[in-house]
């Protein structure tokens, strides 16, 4: 959701988000200010300026924007009934909009968690290395556990294969390290090698250095 201001085309974030469960306040955020050392934790609250999470990931240490939180924002549906839910979004001037819906609780066997592919924990150092690709994500870089897959596509355009991680790695709190083996080492000046991120038909330089 966006907040608009008269006389400008700027887009502003929602000032306050309240989630009510059965008319009781369950989760509330109030964005006014936060300390400099909390800045990067905003990545866990708002993803790419599109999604505002109403739960707190286990690796999220952001404190100043949360007014009231029950069970880290995770609702346990443990009764066979309808849970009445209501979101209230409020802008800086106090104008608000709301949306209501219901969650229907039904008795069922809890599904077993599926771990498909490569599993990284937010709490420990993680290293994956296979064939011509490696990735190291230090403890505290992820805000929550990540389950992903990796595949490669041969490329004639680049000096290495194209490596695809799905789903894409979310914003990190700390830098990760990626290593890719060259399939063609033809540059005499090794400083000219660098990694790129591919998005559709466009490539974006990232960084990198050559190591034999």
Q: What does each model-found stretch correspond to?
A:
Residues 76-82, 187:
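Surface-exposed, short loops/turns at beta-strand junctions within beta-sandwich domains
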Residues 211-212:
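C-terminal beta-strand-rich structural cap/linker in extracellular carbohydrate-active enzymes
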Residues 2-9, 180-184:
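Short amphipathic, basic-aromatic surface patches that mediate peripheral association
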Residues 111-122, 149-200:
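Proteolytic processing hotspots in large secreted/extracellular or virion-associated proteins
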Residues 12-76:
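Exoplasmic/lumenal beta-rich domain surfaces
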């Amino acid at each position: 959701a966006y907040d608009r201001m008269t006389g400008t085309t700027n887009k502003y974030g929602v000032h306050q988000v309240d989630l009510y469960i059965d008319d009781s306040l369950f989760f509330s955020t109030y964005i006014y200010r936060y300390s400099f050392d909390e800045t990067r934790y905003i990545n866990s609250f708002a993803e790419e300026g599109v999604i505002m999470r109403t739960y707190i990931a286990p690796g999220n240490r952001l404190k100043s924007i949360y007014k009231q939180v029950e069970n880290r924002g995770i609702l346990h549906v443990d009764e066979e009934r309808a849970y009445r839910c209501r979101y209230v979004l409020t802008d800086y001037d106090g104008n608000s909009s709301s949306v209501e819906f219901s969650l229907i609780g039904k008795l069922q066997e809890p599904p077993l968690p599926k771990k498909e592919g490569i599993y990284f924990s937010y709490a420990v150092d993680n290293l994956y290395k296979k064939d011509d690709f490696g990735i190291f994500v230090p403890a505290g870089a992820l805000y929550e556990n990540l389950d992903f897959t990796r595949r490669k596509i041969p490329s004639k355009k680049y000096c290495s294969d194209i490596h695809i991680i799905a789903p894409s790695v979310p914003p990190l709190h700390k830098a990760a390290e990626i290593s890719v083996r060259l399939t063609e080492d033809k540059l005499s000046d090794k400083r000219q090698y660098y990694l790129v991120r591919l998005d559709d038909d466009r490539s974006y330089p990232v960084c990198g250095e050559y190591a034999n």
